[in-house]
Design a protein with these regions (language model features):
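Long, low-hydrophobicity ectodomains and other hydrophilic envelope-associated domains
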Residues: 3-161
Length: 161
């Protein structure tokens, strides 16, 4: 039996390393995902993206596939939910769009980095997002592990969308 290079066996410290630099800390139930800051001001569409995709509208850029982040969260014992979606329903003679909310377990997202003065900084991801035009910090947000879905060809949609 061979072990794929994308997963390395846990060390005695309870840490599993995945491809893309992902580190699963089993004892503390933490997943560390390396990233770099793409933009420090401007409008954003999402918090993070893959390199070569939406750097112009994301705060962070990661080099690992979303399916590996999903795997890491499963490795620390979380259960994925289902992403939110829109569904068209016929009501009488009309069609309406119904919002189906996401489901999943709550997660806390923290950001750790060294600032330009060499100081270590740790904050919630919400503290990295400011409202406009008043500049208020984004309110504490209940993030959840929804995962993604698989398309008809069996591909994890978040890996290519």
């Amino acid at each position: 039996m061979t072990v794929k290079k994308s997963i390395r066996q846990p060390s005695s410290s309870g840490i599993i390393h995945l491809a893309g630099g992902i580190e699963c800390r089993l004892d503390s139930r933490e997943v560390l995902v390396p990233a770099f800051i793409a933009i420090d001001s401007g409008w954003i569409e999402q918090i993070a993206c893959l390199r070569g995709t939406r750097e112009h509208e994301s705060i962070f850029v990661v080099e690992c596939q979303p399916s590996l982040v999903h795997s890491a969260l499963l490795l620390i014992g979380l259960e994925s939910g289902v992403p939110g979606r829109w569904q068209e329903r016929k009501r009488g003679e009309r069609y309406e769009i119904e919002r189906i909310p996401p489901t999943g377990v709550p997660v806390r997202i923290r950001v750790r980095f060294t600032d330009t003065d060499g100081r270590f900084v740790e904050s919630s991801v919400e503290e990295m997002v400011m409202g406009s035009p008043d500049g208020a910090v984004f309110p504490p947000t209940p993030w959840m592990f929804c995962g993604s879905r698989f398309d008809r060809e069996g591909r994890y949609v978040a890996d290519y969308s």
